[in-house]
Amino acid sequence: MVTAAGVAGRSCAEPLVGGKRYAIELGALPAMNDAARRKLYASWMSYLPDDALLSALSIPGTHDAATSTLNLWSKCQSLSLGAQLNAGVRCFDLRPTGTDDLMIYHGTSTGVTFDEAIAAMDRYLAACPSEGCIVQMQRQGDAGNDATFRSRMGDYLNSSSAYRDRFVDFRPDLTLGELCGKILVLTRSDYDGALVGGKIASWQDDVTDQISSIVNGSASAKLFIQDKYGGTTGIDNKKNAIIAYLDKARGKAESEWLFNFTSLATAVVTTPKTN
């Protein structure tokens, strides 16, 4: 359930009436007509107050977000980045390699560079400035090398990107209004030059419950991570990890951040909770 308040000055949705607060229940959405549903998905941030903390929101994201061009085992998504944005996705797991063009890989090349992924977000935000994007980024080791990644990514984020003005720096208390029209890049991999966005201090492999942090200079926030992707321990263990983190999200402090991955490498996870 998402609590929403009327906000003026957003171009992608009508403001709610009289400043009253509303509850949008996801289970009720199928009763809407297709046009209304598409509008809600495409501009759902416009229904929330500007002063809402990002860390207090449940923001939908996609694992290996740029893999719709791939086949079989390397393909994690069936929708392009643009289609994902229209569907309401606002957090993107992108894995560029250490090649000159920062090509995104997942076992093999996706044919999508990091710049092209950012460009897709830029186009969407230009058309719908009530929305904002988060990129969770790490270097993929399938091609290139670490030195090239450090150099090219540092140059891209700090100077050469045509979308430099889109990037916003991390703060624990960053609000939805401050993300509107912007892209927050949270990196797991080091690169040269100044940090743009935020750095995830550590991320253990195949982890069920980790406490890490997101930092930028003196700004720091606690980060909880559930990324248990290995399926060899069974589907029920993954379901339990997801449910535990849904519960943790409800109980954590508003200023604390949390990633709850529902992806699994060797099996399909069905809905963890049913009514």
Give the location of each predicted region.
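Active-site beta-loop-alpha junctions enriched in small/polar residues
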Residues: 62, 97, 138-142, 188-190, ...
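Catalytic cores of phosphodiester-bond-cleaving enzymes
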Residues: 115-162
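Aromatic-lined carbohydrate-binding surfaces of glycoside hydrolases
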Residues: 89, 94-102, 142, 146
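Long, acidic (Asp/Glu-rich), low-complexity accessory segments flanking structured domains
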Residues: 2-87, 100-127, 132, 193, ...
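Conserved, mostly hydrophobic/aromatic
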Residues: 95, 135, 185
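C-terminal active-site rim and adjoining tail of enzyme catalytic domains
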Residues: 186-188, 192-275
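Loop/turn elements at helix/coil->beta-strand transitions in domains of secreted/extracellular proteins
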Residues: 87-90, 129-134, 162-163, 179-183, ...
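Short, structural beta-strand-to-alpha-helix junction motif
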Residues: 80, 113, 167-177
